[in-house]
Amino acid sequence: MIPWLLTACIYPCVIGPDFWGLLHGDWRMCTAGQMQSPVNIDPSQLLYDPHLMPINIEGNIVEAVFENTGQLPVVTVKDLPNRPTINITGGPTMPYRYKLHQISVHFGRADEGEKGSEHTVDRVRFPAEIQLLAYNSALYPNFSVAMTSPRGLLAVSVIVDIGKTTSVELRRLTVASQSINYKGQTTNLTDFQPSALLPKTSHYVTYEGSLTFPGCHETVTWVILNNPIYITNDDLQIWNEMQKTETKQPEPSYMTPAYRPLKSLNGRLVRTNINVGSKQSTVSSSCPSNVYVEMGYQANPGRNKRNDSVSRRYVPTSEVFEIDSIRPDDVSKAGSF
């Protein structure tokens, strides 16, 4: 189990993200850090960087352990000798090679219309977010060392939206999650294919940030892919059955919501390899599969009048939010799918 989860699960009624930095000296960045995650992605403020190359995934099938930590469902890739691994190269982390270590799933309460993604796009929160966390194996021997070291980690974020069918590998995880409804339960994943969780796109946005769990180390290069993958409402409800307790209780303690509140950019640049001008002229504004183009890179007052899922989830521009003071539910209450 990840060390912070052990402590966080001991005091579930006391510990919250706002207090992490006060609980342990190694967690001080959770309060004092100026490059914290997650953040809101403002499409109008993205900086196009033509030098950002596509992300490359090397490797295919691995063995992994799927665990209910009491805070999050986490897939940890087994580091076995003479067994395949998943390496990530290219993108903003060149020339380094990053080795996939774990995958976490963040989600909201589906039956209450709550969204669960950690990152938001134009103040819109999505139903779920999958995060693939890899460490710099070119510089560091393992995840623990890399976690506290410069250029140590790469986080690839996949937005999950509601669709008519669930993406195949996500469906497999959904089925497996039914066997780990309670804290501490685990199940083995054989022939697990992490790359199948990624959408078919070479476009992304990227920024320098932190882990979204204690100790919030500011050693993470974030890559948020431009297209979502999909999950049905019924399958999302299955994830909602996961609980924080070790056994069934008279009053269930569900895992949701499972995301950290938004943090300020504090002047950080958010770069993209999407040529905004080119996209606006070649991509239909009604394209449902593109997260950022659908949201609009430039101010577009007309989108508030559109009768689609995006406009229903959009926070009206008349409402002014400060990122650090926004409550988790403020974004999710913008509407439902």
Swiss-Prot record:
The active site is at Y140. It is found in: Secreted. Residues 1-16 form the signal peptide. Gene3D superfamilies: Alpha carbonic anhydrase (3.10.200.10). Keywords: Glycoprotein, Secreted, Signal. One of its GO terms (cellular component) is extracellular region. Substrate binds at T212, F213. The keyword Glycoprotein applies. One of its GO terms (molecular function) is carbonate dehydratase activity. It comes from the Eukaryota. Glycans are attached at N188. Residues 17-274 form the Alpha-carbonic anhydrase domain. Disulfide bonds: none annotated. InterPro entries: Alpha_CARP_X/XI, CA_dom, CA_dom_sf, Carbonic_anhydrase_a-class. Belongs to the alpha-carbonic anhydrase family. This is Putative carbonic anhydrase-like protein 2. The lineage of its organism: Eukaryota, Metazoa, Ecdysozoa, Nematoda, Chromadorea. The gene is cah-2.
